[in-house]
């Protein structure tokens, strides 16, 4: 879990100079971070990992918060969990376009198949996997 304020940050904001309550301050910071994640329904930290997705249709793939553009996208042509097709960046468009609002970088949440490409749609089966950095680009 990402702490949105370190123990040192909290102590500085409250002008606390001793370390008597560091464990309690850290616990409070951790609880506050968990509450923020739960309330917002997303995690603002980042993790680099491989994730699997089931397209709803051939044109648009909804994904978790994608923190950057350095990704590897692969798909399975026959729904057999063998990801035998590697997509190039020219094959899809990350959305929302211009993922920047109110002075903040926003994560990408969709990949649109472009040109003649279509996402392999197999009635709820995970036919796409993406290796990338997930979460919020910056907090």
Where are these regions (language model features)?
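Divalent metal-cofactor coordination and adjacent catalytic microenvironments
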Residues: 1-139
